[in-house]
Amino acid sequence: MVEDTASVAALYRSYLTPLGIDINIVGTGRDAIESLNHRIPDLILLDLRLPDMTGMDVLHAVKKSHPDVPIIFMTAHGSIDTAVEAMRHGSQDFLIKPCEADRLRVTVNNAIRKATKLKNEADNPGNQNYQGFIGSSQTMQQVYRTIDSAASSKASIFITGESGTGKEVCAEAIHAASKRGDKPFIAINCAAIPKDLIESELFGHVKGAFTGAANDRQGAAELADGGTLFLDELCEMDLDLQTKLLRFIQTGTFQKVGSSKMKSVDVRFVCATNRDPWKEVQEGRFREDLYYRLYVIPLHLPPLRERGEDVIEIAYSLLGYMSHEEGKNFVRFSQEVIDRFNSYEWPGNVRQLQNVLRNIVVLNNGKEITLDMLPPPLNQPLDRPSVSKLIEPKAMTVSEIMPLWMTEKMAIEQAIEACDGNIPRAAGYLDVSPSTIYRKLQAWNGKEERQKV
């Protein structure tokens, strides 16, 4: 890692620690070039602005002597033009600082995996860390398998899931595992761009196309040529622009705003929404023909409340680098906090968990996260269903006595129903871990199948 700011280098080291890689940090371009005489790295993370030379100078020197070493640029002074220039001169990717942990891990993990030809995480989706994701639950292993299966295809992928579940991380994982992984990944958030600017953001514009268009500008479609175009929150796109997008998908050609010339590109489409896309079609907010064009391989990201013990795995990973970043000493959670995390519904999903832990780490001190440190609403008592609603006591005859496992099964099923199908929440009320319920349900299903035979 070539980074002249020690605190930033330490932060990014903590982000990458879960990947289990050896990181050597230098502060100048000259030291970076000199270090190659002693050891050839699998990857170089390179700051664009250094005290003795530019990142572009370092890139040229490295590529001259070691052309196969992948380089990823990092800069707080990024622009689209700089990104394009860096990619043109051999940079594998381009990250804008401050860089989020998930984005950095996905990019670095993929670059190293491709450079060394080792596909440990892709070949073993049961690992706790997979392409930037954290978690080994059954629901996430199905996501990993879908990514592995779909990555090599050019077919469009439609990612659905609640806000905060990691849809952009998923899109980057698909791109990273694909044959286009060394080509650009360009993301555009359809909900964050004003209606009158989104066409220009997507297709670009020529000088004088509208007030303020002082120069020609490339759009996301052109920048993604050869790679992946990620359309986030696609269902927010205006119907008129959906028509132009459909034509672009069908033909691979588009016109810049203000231009009559057609441009042709080769991109792989990945899109995402936190809505039900078919419901949007039925209610007239999303074109049906566009839906069928894009909804080729559906991929649903489960909400955090359905990921069982992943909650605690993610929490520990976040706690590690947040404590390091903030200069704190937190290393563990109390059992009460673990139980509360497992029982909470997490309506904001992983993003909410990140914010909760950031709040705790910044405002408190110690080695253990305790219940009194939790911010609202996690510090409020759980709204437990009435026991009388779960099990109605009644007298029974000898003929009505059931095996103990069936009685336990009935109690657990009623608790799950009372919690609207939320197994982790039901587990919290029953004072057992979610994995215990999953294991029992699997065993009971096997017993019932044998009884049928």
UniProtKB/Swiss-Prot annotation:
Disulphides: none
Domain Sigma-54 factor interaction: 133-362
Pfam families in the record: HTH_8, Response_reg, Sigma54_activat
GO BP of this protein: phosphorelay signal transduction system; regulation of DNA-templated transcription
Binding of ATP, residues: 161-168, 224-233
Chain positions with 4-aspartylphosphate modification: 47
Domain Response regulatory, residue spans: 1-112
Assigned keywords, A-Z: ATP-binding, DNA-binding, Nucleotide-binding, Phosphoprotein, Repressor, Transcription, Transcription regulation, Two-component regulatory system
Alphabetical list of CDD domains matching this protein: AAA, REC_NtrC1-like
An annotated Gene Ontology molecular function: ATP hydrolysis activity
Cited function: Involved in the regulation of different processes depending on the cell density. Acts together with sigma-54 to repress, perhaps indirectly, some genes.
The name this protein goes by in its record: Regulatory protein LuxO
Protein source organism: Vibrio parahaemolyticus serotype O3:K6 (strain RIMD 2210633)
Gene it is expressed from: luxO
